Amino acid sequence: LVLLVQRLFGDLLCNTQCAQNFQTLINTQESFMGREVQRALLWVILFGSLFMLWDNYQVWKGGESFFGSVKQEAIEADRSAAAGVPTATVAKTAPALDDATAVKEPIVVTTDRMKVTFDRMGARIVGSEMLLFPQQADWTEVGLAGMVLGREPSPNLGNVKLFDVEGGHAYLAQTGLVGGDYPTHNDEFKLVSQDLALGDKESMKVVFEADKGGLKVTKTFTFKRGYYGIDVDTAVTNTTDKAVTPQIYYQLTRDSSKPAGESSMYSTFTGPAFYTDEENFQKLSFSEIRDKDAKYVEDTNNGWLAMVQHHFVSAWVPPQGEVRHNYTRALGHDLFAVGTLISLKEIAPGATQTNHAVLYSGPQEQARLEQLAPGLELVVDYGWLTFLAKPIYWLLDFLYGIVGNWGWAIVLLTCIVKAVLYPISAAGYRSMARMKEVTPRLKALQEKYKDDKQRLNQAMMELYKTEKINPVGGCLPIMLQIPVFLALYWVLQGSVELRGAEWILWVHDLAMPDPWFVLPALMAATMFLQILLNPKPTDPMQAKVMYIMPVVFSVMFFIFAAGLVLYWLTNNILSIAQQWWINKTIAEERAQRLAKR
């Protein structure tokens, strides 16, 4: 947030017309040094306030505070204590974990998209490895950054894992029955199918069975080629001589730790979410669950539940139209469960009833998520500019379908945005060009009224009116670009489709910073060219700031996604060409006027 605000104010300072004209609109009597001290204090207050807002925003999204966090030793101690929580078997109460991480006997299933690990205990899923998504190295370990910092890329990063119970991590999916002494995720199931590899087949079924409390439960997990969803069918057979009405639950449990590979430069949301027709998408933080302050729809007959992290999601999509009770639980300090509880219809003696749900565990590919369940695509986090980021992503995706390269799609997007804003931008650049023409007259006024600030301001405003110059017109092209810039920032950060997307030569991931800082350096060069085309400031301090800004902001852009820098670089190049053409046109018009005289 601080960097983006600096980018905004920095561009305004680099635009000398804005810098000059804002000063002419401010009537001040303080000395130059007094103004500079006040300005410095205001910047300190601004940055301090923005940093505090940023830190609180990170904590709100489930991240850690810059000022410290709970010690891991305490977390591990509380997690161990949570393992002894007794299992609840009453309606509207979530079943608890007896042991979150102990795997009785792993059973590994392999498809063309993922490797899924089951545990016989509860036929629960304790591992899901994304075969097409390798874990990314931290950007500080590669390219020029790695050379300067003396860091080597982390070896054997492997693939991205969602469900996982290794290395002190706990993240798993469970189902079971409550309402009696029935099979839950804490009871042993028997594997009755033999096929554990998809191979050349289009689909494959993995079947588990368990008998307890007079019920025979058969869980059938169906895997399909090219699909991250798992169809889960739970068949319940009543082997007693009395009718029963059990309840089935679908549950996700995990700790609050950040996923492996999370960038140290920004924090993204990690935590549970619910979706219902009544309240739409509702994100919950782990702290809200711990403090029993989570707000969500508990009783409904629709929707889904999920665990969300950067670029990936795991979600239970139960059958729509069936009444269910959503719940959350804090199992100790660092284990959390979210789930939904559905009452089955009465099962007569000897009868069987089957309940169907889908477990999705994979990337946040928006087209897939939209097809799977209403609102599931909302797990893609575009921040508070979602209303603008969504159409930008749609346009980017459309352009990618044409050119087949996300980098060139960003270049085309920039050209389209520039064309749409051309009328306003042209007016702004014409205003800057006229300002350049009257700069000598402005200097004369400043010399004439150097001891009378109020009269100087009046004279300058009269000059603007006579020459038909908008004092802040040159700011409009930049101001209009800022929302697009911010929205594209969220698109690049939140869209898994751009994860690992190559452009040309050294740019192998548009969602990560440029490893060799070539794009930020080129952006600085274009900013210098823009300065040369702008009117020169009359204030010496502004002149110094103006020439320093390109260097400062190019360094800041070292940590921004390469795709974002590519957008701004392309925008600068187009702006230079547009401003040069307008300056040339105005010079020719002025020459014609002088010739007529």
Task: Indicate where each model-derived feature is located.
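Short hydrophobic transmembrane-like helices used for membrane targeting/insertion
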Residues: 2-5, 26
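Helix-loop-helix
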Residues: 9-76, 118, 232-235, 246-269, ...
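Aromatic/His-enriched, Gly/Pro-containing loop or helix-boundary segments
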Residues: 33-37, 99, 197, 211-212
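Short extracytoplasmic/periplasmic juxtamembrane "stem" segments immediately C-terminal to an N-terminal membrane anchor
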Residues: 68-91
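Intrinsic low-complexity, intrinsically disordered segments
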Residues: 88-117
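Secondary-structure junction/capping motif
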Residues: 92-93, 285, 383, 405
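Soluble non-transmembrane domains of integral membrane proteins
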Residues: 106-378
